[in-house]
Amino acid sequence: MTDDQITELLFVREEPVRADLAMVFGAANEADLARRTRQGVRLYREGYVPRLLVTGGGVLALTRPEAARMADLARQVGVPVADLLVEARSNTTFANARDSRDLLRERGLLEGLATVLLVSSEWLMRRVLLTVQATFPRGIRFVCCPTTEGCTRENWTASEACRREVIQESELLLAFHGPIAARP
């Protein structure tokens, strides 16, 4: 695949709209975790969403769950506890989506859900989008509102580290989702 094809395959960035909540995906990397949390908080503060759902248990059992750390960061900058939903068991993108869906169902929020803003790193947005579309009930609109820091569509080819991650993600996405992923 060419760099342009990889860019079109992976990088999804849409303008935020008013939504029922923002679903903020965790990250093992602390800098990515902070960037994603900041983006979720920005969407909350700007009035796009009335609540944040932070999701991620973390890969290492020895560390505090990603979602708990994100909730702490959000509270430190003024997001009230009442406006935070915390899903702290999952450790894969699929588990993030499944466990978040289940949490929303348990809280009685899934049935009325119309629009959800998705927050992750931009180069992971296609995977996130395909996963939530496959996991959540049909009819929910998902809008990709990634961080604009780190590896982005504008800069990923300039950094060898970003380039490695992005190429690996494109290969994994095509292997896992096949032709569905290739039709953005």
At which residue positions do the language-model features occur?
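Glycine-rich flexible loop motifs, especially short His-Gly-Gly/GGXG/HXGH segments used as catalytic or interaction
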Residues: 157-184
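A structural signal for short, hydrophobic/glycine-enriched beta-strand patches
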Residues: 1-166
